[in-house]
Design a protein with these regions (language model features):
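N-terminal beta-alpha supersecondary unit
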Residues: 1-28
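Short active-site-proximal "capping" loops at secondary-structure junctions
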Residues: 2-4, 31, 35, 114
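Oxyanion-binding and handling regions
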Residues: 4-7, 58-158
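Generic beta-strand or strand-like secondary-structure segments
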Residues: 8, 12, 47-51, 65-68
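Short, flexible active-site loop motifs that bind/organize anionic cofactors or intermediates
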Residues: 17, 35, 129
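Phosphate-handling active-site elements
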Residues: 19-25, 53-63
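Short glycine-rich phosphate-binding loop at a beta-alpha junction
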Residues: 25-33, 106-111
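DPxDG-like acidic metal-binding loop motif
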Residues: 29-59
Length: 158
């Protein structure tokens, strides 16, 4: 979904629950992908998961996209394509990092969205309920940044 994630996410979740004959009150925890990935999409998903968990009185569990890819693949380096010919990668013992996509040997790319969501759900179900609330996993700073100059003054006409 290129645009409109915030508007479509709640109806989409409601449709998924209804298709499985599950109500919000039936949930015991909420799993959410925390990235790395699309900056805005990750922020929307994490904020929604935290809000739902708070309102339902259940924990929200954050799962790294790279960990979910690793859980769903037999081999390769978990890899998420990033802008400008780069990729987010993570070796088994290392922290996520940003590298040139062409430098990744044997990349394990995200599977179909449904499979990635299932891997996130499995990892969240197996995780401790006592961890910190999920937060976006940022490997690099956002492209947009606050203005460095002071905000302009608005003058009265009087």
């Amino acid at each position: 979904m290129a645009r409109g994630q915030a508007e479509r996410l709640m109806p989409l979740l409601q449709d998924i629950l209804a298709s499985q004959d599950v109500a919000w009150r039936d949930l015991s925890r909420i799993g959410v992908g925390i990235g790395p990935g699309n900056f805005t999409g990750i922020r929307i998903s994490v904020a929604l998961a935290r809000g739902l968990a708070l309102s339902l009185g259940i924990p929200a569990i954050g799962v790294s996209t790279l960990d979910a890819i690793r859980a769903g693949t037999a081999s390769g380096i978990p890899c998420v394509p990033a802008p400008r010919g780069q990729a987010y990668v993570q070796t088994e013992t290392g922290q996520p990092r940003l590298v040139a996509f062409d430098d990744v040997e044997h990349p394990a790319l995200p599977s179909a969205p449904g499979e990635l969501a299932q891997a996130i759900a499995r990892l969240a179900a197996a995780a401790s309920r006592d961890g910190p609330p999920p937060a976006p996993l940022y490997v690099r700073p956002a492209d947009a940044a606050p203005a460095r100059d002071a905000a302009p003054r608005i003058l009265d006409d009087a």
